[in-house]
């Protein structure tokens, strides 16, 4: 792990996915499992303290960015304002910005993580407790083959075309579908396509929606399976 001290208030970390795995974590759980991500974070902070006497004596402002080979974490010491209603963040010599606590610092950080995961993996998290996956197919014949292989219920699926590729968006309700079932369905889908790095928001906005609902069932009913 690389540690760089930006100034008296800020430290910058870069840790590779290989290093993360060597520490007993995996790249998925640091985004999805809050307890494990906090465990990794405090392990990093302990090293920062030993490395450069970066002691924590108050609230922190944390920015996380995913890059190709790992993650970058920027940690800035903050202070509560005298009235206790704002966080004061130093951004330069004699410069401070105020962030109202009622904006929900924790929710802002969590939303940044969610947006970063969506951008990196094509996974979409929704406020209603559902989450979706966007799968890319290079050939429509692969979508046809999948439609005859996989039959499911209570799962939202849509079909899009974008930049000469086809995309199937599937959305799961974690109340109706357990992790084992979701993994089974995704493993079958990924035999025919690959997880997209695009988000459903981009594909739905700039691409063309071919089938709005029951996409695989519609394809199965209109295109015979290849023998």
UniProtKB/Swiss-Prot annotation:
GO terms for biological process: establishment of competence for transformation; negative regulation of establishment of competence for transformation; negative regulation of sporulation resulting in formation of a cellular spore; sporulation resulting in formation of a cellular spore. It comes from the Bacteria. Keywords: Competence, Sporulation. One of its GO terms (molecular function) is protein-macromolecule adaptor activity. InterPro entries: MecA_C_sf, Neg-reg_MecA. Disulfide bonds: none annotated. Enables the recognition and targeting of unfolded and aggregated proteins to the ClpC protease or to other proteins involved in proteolysis. Acts negatively in the development of competence by binding ComK and recruiting it to the ClpCP protease. When overexpressed, inhibits sporulation. Also involved in Spx degradation by ClpC. The N-terminal domain has binding sites for ComK and probably for unfolded/aggregated proteins; the C-terminal domain interacts with ClpC. Belongs to the MecA family. Homodimer. This is Adapter protein MecA 1. It comes from Bacillus cereus (strain ATCC 14579 / DSM 31 / CCUG 7414 / JCM 2152 / NBRC 15305 / NCIMB 9373 / NCTC 2599 / NRRL B-3711). The gene is mecA1.
């Amino acid at each position: 792990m690389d540690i760089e001290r930006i100034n008296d208030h800020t430290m910058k970390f870069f840790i590779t996915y290989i290093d993360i795995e060597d520490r007993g974590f995996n790249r998925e759980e640091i985004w999805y499992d809050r307890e494990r991500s906090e465990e990794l974070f405090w392990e990093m902070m302990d090293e920062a303290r030993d490395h450069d006497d970066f002691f924590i004596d108050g609230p922190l402002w944390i920015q996380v960015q995913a890059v190709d080979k790992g993650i970058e974490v920027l940690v800035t010491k903050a202070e509560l304002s005298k009235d206790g209603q704002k966080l004061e963040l130093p951004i330069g010599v004699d410069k401070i910005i105020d962030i109202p606590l009622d904006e929900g610092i924790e929710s802002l950080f969590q939303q940044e993580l969610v947006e970063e995961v969506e951008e990196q993996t094509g996974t979409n998290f929704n406020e209603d407790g559902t989450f979706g996956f966007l799968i890319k197919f290079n050939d429509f014949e692969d979508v046809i083959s999948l439609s005859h292989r996989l039959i499911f219920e209570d799962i939202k699926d849509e079909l899009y075309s974008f930049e000469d590729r086809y995309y199937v968006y599937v959305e799961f309700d974690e109340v109706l579908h357990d992790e084992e079932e979701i993994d089974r369905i995704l493993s079958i889908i990924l035999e025919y396509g690959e997880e997209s790095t695009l988000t459903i928001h981009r594909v739905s906005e700039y691409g063309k929606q071919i089938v709005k609902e029951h996409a695989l069932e519609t394809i199965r009913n209109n295109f015979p399976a290849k023998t």
